[in-house]
Amino acid sequence: MEYVLETNALIKSYRGYTALGGLDMRVPRGAVYGLVGRNGAGKTTLIRIICGLQAPTGGGYTLYGVKNTDRAIRKSRRRIGAVVEMPSIYSDMTAEENIRMQYRVLGVPSYDGAAGLLRLVGLDGTGKKKVRNFSLGMRQRLGIAVALAGDPDLLVLDEPVNGLDPQGIIEMRELILKLNRERGITVLISSHILDELSRLATHYGFIDGGRMVKEISAEELERAARKCMSLRVSDTVPLVPVLDRLGAEYTVISGNEVKLYTPMPVCVLSDELSGVGCRLLNVTEQDESLESFYMELLGGERHA
């Protein structure tokens, strides 16, 4: 498998704080790679290093086979388009003027591609409308159009649907999928909206505390998903000893929710709980989702 990006024991430290603590990561060519982690896990720091906005303290990475210490890394970085944190756009310009400005920055001799980029992101009808009058979703799509001005092979997006309304989220999803499937652009997405990420990603990287906990493909995740029962109870504190006594495998999700992986008649469970003063509020059968996999991997306490 060919990888467009590989990190090797990547470290980024600040005064008294380590943002990345030896992170290893591999992004396959043509993938939509979802970077998953809590706020403060190191996602944005990683993206800023990849884009050349920060330098690593230790370790390294390769981008299209070129090491970050090689002088040729600047040429490899030109194959990246990125929207990090907020789109780098000018609010007193039109959408087309923003793209033309990026062409000038990149040294592109012709503006002929501007109209095509606006059509691609669904902003071709904005005309003379200033960006300050755009919705957040329109601004995000313009940010992607600006990132595409250099005709990149890798698109890096930091929280691209954050703050968008449902329609804006749908439009962003369709755009990302179009860029990946029709143009063959590899996409690296950092997001905490796991349900939306599960509709996009072909591969996932779960990071916590500045380290890679697990990398897995969407197909592997689907195979690993198991049926379970989601139990909502009045309090998980009295529930846990009951499940331990019954030899059940489970994950505590919150103070009133548990994922139960061991098949068990609801009537038996209800009787057991009534004896310890715990009320069973709701039971639903479900397959493990990206969210439950994440909770099990990083956020929940697993028992077996």
Residue locations for each model-derived region?
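ABC transporter nucleotide-binding domain
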Residues: 173-261
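Short, charged/small-residue-rich alpha-helical element at the C-terminal edge
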Residues: 227-297, 304
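Short, Lys/Arg-enriched, disordered terminal segments
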Residues: 1-3, 300-304
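ABC transporter nucleotide-binding domains
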Residues: 2-5, 12-189, 194-208, 212-214
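Generic beta-strand hydrophobic packing signal
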Residues: 8-10, 23, 251, 283
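Non-catalytic surface loops within mature trypsin-like serine protease
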Residues: 29, 125, 142, 235, ...
